Amino acid sequence: MLPFCDKMEKKRTEGYAMKQTKIGLVTVGHYIYFEQFEGLFEELSRKGEAFAALLREEDCEICNAGYIDRPEDAFTAVRALKREDIDLLFIVLSTYVPSAVCAPFAKYLDVSQILIGIQPLEHLDYSHATTYMQLCNDDVCAMPEVAGVYRRLGKSIPPCIIASASMEGYIRSQVREWIAAARAMAAFKYETIGYLGHTYEGMYDMNTDPTAFTAAFGAHVKMLEICELSRLAEEVTEEETKRKIAHVRNIFEICDPSIDPLTDFVKDEDLALSARISVALKRLVEQNGLCALAYYYKSEKNNPYEPLSANLIIGNTLLTSSGIPLAGEADLKTAAAMLIMKALGGGGSFAEIHPFDTESNVVLVGHDGPHHIGISDGKPRLRKLKKYHGKSGSGIGVEFSLRSGPITMLSISVDENGKMQMIAAEGESLPGEIPQTGNTNTRVSFGCPIHEFLCRWCEAGPTHHFALGIGHHIAALRKFSVISGISLIEVK
């Protein structure tokens, strides 16, 4: 059967198109059986059709190579799948299949592959069992042989999904997690991440080798200059600024000063400056074709770039919330973590550890920006800050908590061998008071004494920044680790 590609309608995030993940599918069998058992081909083919229907429920584009039962047909399917440039391949074993039928996929397709063995029956009807019935339920018979041939061909043994058809919930969750992991990897494919400025002075954990980053994730790291952003800001018209101000007023609650003496009233000119820079920042991203941006500009006092670099928070928050993650202090690795979290459906805000609360057994996590307002608990607030602690200039900060419920923290750091590694933990966002300091803060519990969790987290070697997202995503991150080859440390 000749391959074809099922073009599904592309879904979009607010503001920016989500790149569609291409999922390959092939169903394999043994042609000799079909000469011996009438109707068996049709019955086994339906297994691939059923799996394709399952894939259509997910946000992906399906490239279905059909039913393959000879090595020669596998060669044809491989060439077609290579043309489609798929991100992941599911191989449905419909019955016993000689490993020669699967070997071409192992040898010639440089993409993660998953072996599927879904047995129709929970058990054979032993008193009425026939050879035909056994062949219809021999989905796992060849799996050891097929898995072994990957190793003999110098490839990693593929992960396997083995279940009876009645285990529908398990099958769906496994498929969904693998597709989410493939989507996270595809988020970097043929993409460009911007790097504006330099890392915050002295933050060794922020320093990243751009070539090592490309080796790990695939995306190109493009060096940008603050003067380009300055030029774009000068080109913003008064009408564009007014429209952005109206947009900001619609999204945010503008707050008066709090008890913190660093807070101040948000004046019209403050809002106008942030709005103008927001328009320019969006244009910078679009003109350079960026999927994410890491930025930091120290700025000398009263330098003409100081107001520009100090008033990025509204713009970077709007971009992050629309699907283009921005990471402050030029944290390239956390920009990647935010992009992964976005692809997994968790949103992804820029965060670090703030003070903990032993009485409530929570830790506050947040930052002065950038943030993802799509996962906030209620309307986000704006506060004017007379100064940023540790940074130059003054400007408007964003303040909110993540909505209550499950959360995931994802940090990406570098190990002693210079390799990227992920550190992740799952917790719970809880309601309650947060400081009114123009920063985000979320009260997070981890189901154990908070000081013990923090010890384990710090001892795992993360960067001090991380992506904070809603939902529990470690199961999908495990699969992303398999696909990407980036190790994962789970902190519990």
What are these regions (language model features)?
Residues 3-10, 14:
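Short, positively charged and aromatic/hydrophobic N-terminal segments
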Residues 20-23, 59, 122-259:
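Cap/lid and interdomain-hinge subdomains that line or gate substrate/regulatory clefts
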Residues 40-56:
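Short catalytic helix/loop segments, enriched in acidic residues and glycine
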Residues 86-95, 114-116, 291-295:
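Periplasmic-binding protein-like
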Residues 104-129, 134-142, 316-329:
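Short, acidic/small-residue loops that bind anionic groups at enzyme active sites
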Residues 242-335, 342-343:
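Long, internal scaffold/assembly segments composed of regular secondary structure
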Residues 318-435:
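C-terminal catalytic subdomain
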Residues 389-492:
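Extended hydrophobic packing segments that form well-structured cores
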